[in-house]
Each structure stands twice: as C-alpha cells, then as structure tokens.
Amino acid sequence: KMYDVVRVSEKKLIGEIIELRGDKASIQVYEETGGLGPGETVESTGVPLSVELAPGLIEGIFDGIQRPLTRIAAAYGDRITRGISVTNLDHEKEWEFVPLAREGDEVQAGDFLGYVQETPIVRHKIMVPYGVAGKVTYIRGGMYNITQTVAKIATQKGEREICMLTRWPVRRGRPYREKMSPEMPMIT
C-alpha cells in the first residue's frame, strides 16, 4: 500500500513505498543502500511511516525518521548501524501522570486528560486521541510508562484504554479545533 513502511533485504533496512505501478513498487530507503540490488526481499509492515508522540519527545535527539540517536549511540556506538530496530521513544521510562479530567467527565478528541511535567518548563498534555469521544470511566495519577493505561473512556464502540503514547502517520496533518496565535515566543 502507498506510504507503508517496508523492510528491505536481510539487513531489514527501513524504507517507504512511494510509488505503485501494477505489481511493482518504488521504495525510498532511508538508510545506506550500498550492496543492494534488484530482487532483494521486501517485507511490508502494513503501517504508514509514523512518529511516536508522548513524554520523552522533548528530551530526545532524533534523526529524520525519529530514530533516537542518543539511545542508538549508547547501544551501538557512534555510527548508526544499518537495519537496527529500536523504539522511537523509551517505552520503559516512567513518568508522573497528573490527571486533569475526572471519572464521569464527558470528553472528546483533543480534550486534556492530564499532563506530565516533562521538563521544568514543558508540561506535556495528554489528550483524548483523535476519533475518541465518551465518558471517562477510569483515570488515575501516578508513575506510568508511556504504554500503560492511564485512563479508560466508554465510547459508542465500547471501552477504550488510553495510554500516554500516540502513533501518528507523518503524511497526515494533525486535526485541531482552532488555530491559536502564540502569546509569547518559546526561547530555547
């Protein structure tokens, strides 16, 4: 499928389908392709190129496809080895989740469920994911990693567990209710 992430050759290089013509695909490989040739195996992941949005994003240093350069350097050395596979954000690190919503609240996409104080000046808001609306049936503060459930929402399609991690396709714009003009610049 167009824009799906693929793994190329036995080295599992990261690529993306950028053109389809019949049963042939053109693939943009995001790593060094030396030594590759026609007929290499290609395995589709079935998902589009996406980024992980969660606490830990602000403190990280990433390459263009959100590979965590500091974690890669710690595990593999200063050179990025071809075909390595690591999670974009640290899925094990725990963050203190502070609830803003309460059980019984009616919420919809973009509403704040709580926050994580990611840095002394950055408060990372945890929002109701796109496409989710309903009543908060569970929400608890405490220490969680980004994949653990911090809230549950009863929707028309059943109960939905909410964690602090959202994966978002890079080629799809983020929805918003209104555009807010900046009140003061963030000087870094």
Feature-to-residue mapping (PLM):
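P-loop NTPase nucleotide-binding/switch module
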Residues: 74-129, 145-188
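Electropositive phosphate-/nucleotide-binding environments in soluble metabolic enzymes
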Residues: 30-33, 55, 101, 107, ...
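Conserved hydrophobic positions within beta-strands
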Residues: 17, 61, 112, 136-138
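Residue-level recognition of beta-strand microenvironments
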Residues: 20, 64, 100, 116-119, ...
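Short alpha-helix capping/helix-loop boundary micro-motifs
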Residues: 1, 25-31, 91-102, 135-139
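N-terminal accessory targeting/assembly segments
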Residues: 1-73, 78-81
